[in-house]
C-alpha cells in the first residue's frame, strides 16, 4: 500500500438510497474517467454519462464530476461518479474501477489526510470535517463549520505569529548583550508576553466551550437504592427511559441517555443503587456504577428526603463521599420534595450545591438543568465559536504552562535563554493543533476515526 496509489471509496452512507457516490483521487483518476466514462468530463461541470463495464455494457448512468489537481479537495486529480444508490449497482461499479491497475480502496479518512498533506486543509480543519458529520446539535454543527472554515486555526495562527515576534525580540536580547539598553528588563518583553498570555487564555476559554459542545458532559446519578435515581433520569430525558418501581434495586445495570440543555450535550448515566449486593448480578451492577462514577464530570448524589433531614453529604453517607475521587464535583439532590414539603430550589452546603426537587412530579428539575449548564460554564450565545477536541485543550494548557514558566524565568532571574526555550515549547504545542508540528502516529490516530469516503 502506497500513499501514491490512486484511491477510491463510496462517499455516501452504505445501504439503499436515491444517490450513491464513488470518489476517486490520485494520478490515475483521469484513466478511470477515460475507461469507465469513455471521455474526460469538462472540469467542474456536471456531465450526465453512462458508466460502462469492461465489455462495454452499461452498469449505470449518472453524473460525473472532474476536478483536476491541484484545484480539488485533496489537491490531486479527483473524479466523482454519482449514480443510483443501490448497493449492488455501487458494488459492481466499484469492482469495475478496481480492475484498473494502481487503484485501491481508500483507508478511513484518507481523502482528508491527503488534503492535509497537500496543504488544502490544516489539521484542525480536517478534524472539523469529522466533527461536522458527527454533530449532535445545531450549535455543534455551526461551530464545527466555523472550525472547518478556519476560525479556530486563525486564532491559533495569530498566537503562533505573536510568539514568533516575541522569540525574535528575546533572541536579539540574548545575541547582543552589550547593547546599552537591556531588552530583557526594559519592560517591553514582559508586556508582550502578558499580551500573548491574555490572548491564549481567551482562546482556551473558547476551546473549553467548543470541547463541551463536542464531547458533552458526563453526569452520573448515584445513591442508595430507591432514592429516585431512575425517576430523575426519566425527568431529565423527558421520557420513560428507565423502569421505575417501589422495589429497591430495580436498576441492576448502567442506563445511558443523551440529552441537550440549551444546546449543551449531556450524557446522563443512571446506576444501580449502592449497597451490599444481594446476588452476583447486583454485585456486577454496583461495580459498574463505581466505574462510571470514577469517570464522571459530575456526580448527582441522590438522597431520599423522607429518610433523613441531613443536607451535608459527609453526614448523609460518609463512606460514599470518602470513596469518591478527590476532585470530582458533587451536587446533592434531595428528592421527594413533594412528600417532605421542602422548599424547592438551590443552595450551598460545605462547598457542594444542594438542590431540592421532586423527580416524580418534575418540580425543581429545571433548577437542576440550569445548575448543570452553569456548573460547566456553558455559554448559550456562542456566536462565531468553534469546536475543539481534548488534544486541542491539552496543547493549549501545555502552551499556557510554558508561558507562565517563561514569565517566571524572566521576572525571577532575567534568564533570557530559559525564556526563549519556554517560548519555543509553547509555540511547538500550538503548532501541534494545526499540524505544523506533529507526528505520524498522531496523524494516523486522527484520520483513522474518519468515514471511509472522507
UniProtKB/Swiss-Prot annotation:
SUPFAM superfamilies: P-loop containing nucleoside triphosphate hydrolases, TrmE connector domain
Broad enzyme group: hydrolase
Annotated positions binding (6S)-5-formyl-5,6,7,8-tetrahydrofolate: 23, 80, 120, 454
Pfam families according to UniProt: MMR_HSR1, MnmE_helical, TrmE_N
Main location per the UniProt record: cytoplasm
Keywords for this protein: Cytoplasm, GTP-binding, Hydrolase, Magnesium, Metal-binding, Nucleotide-binding, Potassium, tRNA processing
Cofactor note: Binds 1 potassium ion per subunit.
Binding site for GTP: 226-231, 245-251, 270-273, 335-338, 358-360
Any single GO BP term: tRNA methylation
Protein name as catalogued: tRNA modification GTPase MnmE
Role played: Exhibits a very high intrinsic GTPase hydrolysis rate. Involved in the addition of a carboxymethylaminomethyl (cmnm) group at the wobble position (U34) of certain tRNAs, forming tRNA-cmnm(5)s(2)U34.
One example GO MF annotation: GTPase activity
Boundaries of every TrmE-type G domain copy: 216-377
Binding locations of Mg(2+): 230, 251
Residue sites binding K(+) per the record: 226, 245, 247, 250
EC number: 3.6.-.-
Subcellular location: Cytoplasm
Self-association state and partner proteins as the record states: Homodimer. Heterotetramer of two MnmE and two MnmG subunits.
Family from the record: Belongs to the TRAFAC class TrmE-Era-EngA-EngB-Septin-like GTPase superfamily. TrmE GTPase family.
